Amino acid sequence: MKIGIIAYQGSFEEHYLQLKRAFDKWSINGEITPVKIPKDLKDIDGVIIPGGESTTIGLVAKRLGILDELKEKITSGLPVMGTCAGAIMLAKEVSDAKVGKTSQPLIGTMNISIIRNYYGRQRESFETIIDLSKIGKGKANVVFIRAPAITKLWGKAQSLAELNGVTVLAEENNILATTFHPELSDTTSIHEYFLHLVKG
């Protein structure tokens, strides 16, 4: 199994370590590789789009020619997990809590609507407990950093976890989106669930 991690910015190393822990837990002989240009997508079984600044990630990905390639592969069934800014990249509808609708480059393959900076400056970073029973796990302590919120889901997209009634983890077929940072958690539950999607 070969998992790629988009490596423009964001927590590449933290995702790498969480994947290694999940591989070890499941006794998977897996490979993890950074993804920056289209040829890096060759022969991967799944891809992670980490957090960071979604507009920057989108612009760099578009300039390097990987944005359309990612969209095509994800549409064709490549398993993908987008965390925080990565979830924004996957959404079909994006707006900002302050400025409204945005025109940033998106992959746009998931039937969800996201509001950037949903929790505002007062809560730029916080930790809390969420219930992961819908993915067969227990409660988990997770980290939110300038987090967006998934405010609408349609089609086959479904909510897998909520915080105060707002979706923070969603899935649609081969696509997984989290508004928190699972790579900063003390549990590998989310990465394990992603590997479950990759294994099919």
From Swiss-Prot:
Keywords: Glutamine amidotransferase, Hydrolase, Lyase, Pyridoxal phosphate
Catalytic activity: aldehydo-D-ribose 5-phosphate + D-glyceraldehyde 3-phosphate + L-glutamine = pyridoxal 5'-phosphate + L-glutamate + phosphate + 3 H2O + H(+); L-glutamine + H2O = L-glutamate + NH4(+)
Matching PROSITE patterns: PDXT_SNO_1 (PS01236), PDXT_SNO_2 (PS51130)
InterPro entries reported for this sequence: Class_I_gatase-like, PdxT/SNO, PdxT/SNO_CS
Signal peptide location: none
List of residues binding L-glutamine: G52, E53, S54, R116, I145, R146
UniProt GO molecular function: glutaminase activity; pyridoxal 5'-phosphate synthase (glutamine hydrolysing) activity
Highest taxon of the lineage: Archaea
Function: Catalyzes the hydrolysis of glutamine to glutamate and ammonia as part of the biosynthesis of pyridoxal 5'-phosphate. The resulting ammonia molecule is channeled to the active site of PdxS.
Family: Belongs to the glutaminase PdxT/SNO family.
Descriptive protein name: Pyridoxal 5'-phosphate synthase subunit PdxT
Originating species: Saccharolobus islandicus (strain L.S.2.15 / Lassen #1)
Upper lineage: Archaea, Thermoproteota, Thermoprotei, Sulfolobales, Sulfolobaceae
